[in-house]
């Protein structure tokens, strides 16, 4: 976007249109709650966030939408003023979640400290890009755990790829500390599978977080899509069933476990009440033509009815025809 904007190829209206199209795809797929990271700071200031807020306005009665201010580096020390100013502007604009990339910062501890300081001051949630690398020594998740513990701030750590590179004896106590701090971990299979492991042509790592160690420790494990049809992931259709299928295939999860990562676990990470088929529960539901969770993930049926608060907010129908063959 930044390069295209500088070249005059894409402007505000085009950004708004693209975001609306993405939200339409999500809603049609059955998504009634979404969190998206928007670059804030540096040369873009809050322009992308302004476009996202405008695009989301027409969808807010159909789905819950919150934006993360993914703050440019650095967030502390020399050169941080412009980024922190943009972050404060984003907070004024109403961004719900504060984010950053501590593992890419010159001082990860100061970055995480600043994020939690602002989150506490402005009563915001925290969602950080954490350790998106195959380097097992990159463990800024420890900083996130330390600041999250006892803070009362709803905290999410996305990616956490390096955890998947650790031996069991090292990852187990770390996973237990994540669970104790009530930090949700988000695996992002589409983008992590595409980006990670390019320097390892033999026995290429999958680039996913330590899925089973985290689950065994009681961590709230979530799965998301991250990028869709951009330079970081050329494909992707904004369909949670695609994400769940990758968690089954690449993460060796059972279908019911994978489905939880895109549904109930995701709502928990967002601070939303759990949904169950009971009187009095939120009627945020998706109806698909499938006889089981496994079948729904495997076939990702196109026919879908999406309900939000008991009202139908999206409906998709598809028809297959097999005309007679002329012989």
Predicted features and spans:
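Short beta-strand segments at enzyme active-site cores
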Residues: 31-37, 65-68, 187, 223-225
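Active-site-proximal loop/turn and secondary-structure-junction residues that shape catalytic pockets
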Residues: 40-42, 69-75, 103-104, 132-136, ...
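Histidine/acidic residue-rich metal-binding segments in metalloenzymes
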Residues: 47-61, 78-158, 162-184, 201-223, ...
């Amino acid at each position: 976007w930044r390069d295209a904007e500088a070249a005059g190829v894409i402007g505000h209206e085009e950004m708004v249109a693209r975001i609306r199209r993405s939200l339409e795809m999500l809603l049609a797929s059955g998504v009634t709650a979404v969190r998206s990271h928007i670059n804030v700071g540096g040369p873009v200031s809050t322009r992308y966030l302004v476009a996202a807020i405008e695009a989301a306005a027409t969808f807010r009665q159909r789905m819950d939408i919150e934006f993360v201010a993914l703050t440019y580096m650095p967030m502390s020390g020399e050169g941080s003023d412009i980024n922190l100013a943009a972050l404060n502007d984003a907070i004024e604009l109403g961004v719900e979640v504060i984010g950053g990339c501590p593992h890419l910062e010159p001082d990860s501890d100061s970055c995480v400290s600043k994020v939690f300081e602002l989150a506490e001051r402005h009563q915001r949630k925290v969602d950080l890009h954490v350790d998106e690398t195959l380097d097992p020594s990159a463990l800024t998740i420890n900083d996130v755990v330390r600041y999250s513990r006892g803070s009362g701030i709803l905290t999410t750590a996305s990616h956490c790829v390096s955890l998947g590179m650790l031996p069991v004896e090292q990852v187990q106590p770390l996973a237990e500390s994540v669970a104790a701090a009530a930090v949700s971990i988000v695996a992002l299979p589409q983008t992590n599978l595409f980006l990670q492991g390019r320097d390892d042509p033999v026995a290429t790592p999958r680039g996913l977080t330590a899925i089973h160690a985290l689950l065994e420790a009681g961590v709230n494990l979530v799965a998301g899509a991250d990028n869709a049809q951009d330079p970081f992931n050329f494909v992707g259709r904004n369909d949670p069933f695609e994400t769940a299928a990758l968690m089954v295939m690449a993460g060796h999860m059972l279908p019911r476990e994978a489905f939880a990562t895109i549904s109930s676990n995701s709502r928990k990470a967002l601070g939303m009440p759990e949904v169950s088929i009971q009187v009095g529960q939120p009627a945020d539901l998706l109806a698909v033509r499938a006889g089981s969770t496994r079948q729904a993930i495997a076939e990702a049926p196109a026919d879908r009815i999406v309900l939000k608060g008991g009202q139908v907010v999206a409906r998709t129908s598809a028809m297959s025809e097999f005309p007679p063959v002329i012989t």
